[in-house]
Amino acid sequence: MGYKDRIFNNEQGDILLDSIAQQNAILRVIASDKMTALTSDFKEIQRIVKSGNASTIFNIGDQINVPWRDVSGNQDYVMPFDIVHFGDVTLKDGTTVPGMWLQAHYCTPFDIQFSNAQAFYYAKTELPAGTYYITLTKDWGSNAKKGKSYQFTLSKPVPAGGQLRGFVRMPDAAPSTWKVYSHKDNKSVDPIETIDVTEGTSGTKLGDMPYDTAIDTSLTYPLNNMQRTAYGDNRWANSAYEQWLNSKAAAGAWWLPRDEYDVPPSQLSGKAGFMSGFGDDFLSVIQPVKVKTAKNTTAFDGSFDETYDTFFLPSLEQIYAQTQIAGEGDYWEYWKHALGRTTPNGWYDSNRNDAYKTYAINAKTSAQHVRLRSAYRGYANHTWHVNSGGYVNNYHAYWSYRCAPACVIC
């Protein structure tokens, strides 16, 4: 046989190299004595994932136990992560690499707001002291009525860059309980003043408050819409949850406003960033990956945001639930198998499935509501979640729920 006859072509060489890498991965597992030993060696797991052999060594449903500390609560936990999917990911630099997708088996020990109720007014220039009113544009719930106007009197000016907040829970709270809070900027927690609201049209009209559409920034007094003012914003890329999950900062330091109408989440001062609870050994094997999430079709155009998140909430699509739009990620085999279905699970109580129940890491017999990142596309303020009863539902971004976050070893 001649020299040239013994040379592998490129395809044969690639096959051989893949085979050698797979054999080496298997040998390392054998050498590690036990799978339990391997699943605590994060760097070795990462080497296997990078070699493209994770699905040969691991099974969907295998668990990796990771120490996590609730820094603010001074409480240590072991957080089991289920292997839910094998699939390529895109990194910030645009490269595509193999990934092993993990999701927390239990949910977090406390709640976080997806989004606080947003400000209804942003001061492009100083708003002088005086009486002002706004007019609602749609009947909503028992208390918000189309054409009704509500007035309030500022005793102090609102500086340029400041906000007016208020009308929180307007469809469900009696108008007699409504308040307006003036703030110096979109980061402040304590108001300049708290003002009573009464029905009336005295003073200067700030404008007609739209129901669910985009803010018209060309107006002299641009008003947020009723939905986001009452119950928050359902856009994952702007959410408090996205910031909390991806921060190692201390309590009070993990959130920044994403737009002029954003408001600090209620948990900002009381909880440290989620990533602060992990050791560097685990954080070194996960990194930000591209996450696609559809925007709503009322205040936005329904297109997709692309964020790069180390930790993220699952989408409807990823937990094998019925979707409103495809493109928020491949379904995870873990959920298809757990649900025992060959088609995606439907929504609401009539489609409950006990496999969806997620229990608290600090109360492992107590099922909890857990957040998803998918927006309910027909509203500006509703996001999807998995109800504690085991069914997929949607509700206001304002409410604080727990989560079972995901990440990718890559």
Predicted regions and their residues:
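Collagenous Gly-X-Y triple-helix signature in extracellular proteins
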Residues: 25-410
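Short, low-complexity N-terminal tether/leader segments at secretion or assembly junctions of large
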Residues: 1-25
